[in-house]
Amino acid sequence: MDYLKKVLLDVFDLNADRASMEEISERIESGALLKGTNMAILILAMFIASIGLNMNSTAVIIGAMLISPLMGVIMAIGYGIATYDTAYVRKSFLKLLFQIGFCILTSTIYFYISPISTASSELLARTEPTIWDVLIALFGGLAGIIGITRKEKSNVIPGVAIATALMPPLCTAGYGIATHSLKFFSGALYLFC
């Protein structure tokens, strides 16, 4: 029994390849920046997601999820909570609110000028969240925590970005505003939150 316990502890040891606190902090800081590359990628991800939703293209929407920098600010909020840094949590939360507002505003403009106004199945899928969406967010967040704290870069963070699908609900909320549909707007924001 002791041998089995030792083997299990060895197999599930998360400290073996853990990055230093400085490395973790630096990664999270760089992912939470709201300027330069991160802002350019945010804009591009929003347009890619909006076009994918408009054209009903799952592959394009997944591409937008992969490049979206929204995960960085959310990780920063979690890091601030974990380190009891309320000022950092507040600063990161304000950054997230800015990103949310910016994405909704720009996607609203996109959908307002888009010649395609019919709701695709991809748009509809983001208006009725279920308990499964909550579980995906919970387990995705846990995987993200483990992934960002490793010494070596892994494919965990892109996988979490796809699983949690942050950008498409914001763009769907923009669609709801552009088409004056409270159902799309409220359902998509509920899914995002």
PLM region spans:
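Alpha-helical transmembrane segments and their membrane-interface boundaries
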Residues: 2-141, 150-152
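Small-residue-rich segments of transmembrane alpha-helices in multi-pass membrane proteins
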Residues: 97-107, 162-174
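Structural signal for the N-terminal portions of transmembrane helices
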Residues: 91-92, 157, 161, 181-193
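Alpha-helical transmembrane bundle and helix-membrane interface signal
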Residues: 23, 148-156, 176-183
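Small-residue-enriched core segments of transmembrane alpha-helices in multipass membrane transport
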Residues: 65-70, 133, 161-169, 192-193
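Alpha-helical membrane segments and immediately flanking helix-loop junctions
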Residues: 139-143, 157-167
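Hydrophobic alpha-helical membrane segments of integral membrane proteins
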Residues: 59-66, 154-160, 173-174, 186-187
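Transmembrane helix-loop junctions at the membrane interface of multipass transporters and ion channels
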Residues: 83, 113, 117-121, 170-191
